[in-house]
Amino acid sequence: MARIELAPEIAEDFDRILNHLASHDVEYAGQRVAGIISALNILEHNPLIGRPVANAKRELIIGRRGQGHVALYRYVPEIDAVFVLAIRSQREAGYPERDSEA
């Protein structure tokens, strides 16, 4: 079972997501974030489920349509660990620029 580590910047991603949901008066915003966290837990048992992207990273698609999100992560099989680097809405273009991305 792979260990899951969240980058410190993930807190900023959740803040951005919650602020967006609040600005659109979305009910159950906390449940949406809980759904994202629940989806990330899938990576414990299946770390290669995400689609491959550049630089040995992968993307996990979470949810669907206007409620969907994408988690950028890297799996390191040598230590059986998943490092979640960023989370964004499926409607956002790209990820925030971060100096610490591995």
What is each of the regions a protein language model found here?
Residues L21, R64-A102:
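Enriched for short, Lys/Arg-rich terminal
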Residues M1-E59, R64, E78, E101-A102:
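Basic, Lys/Arg-enriched alpha-helical interface segments
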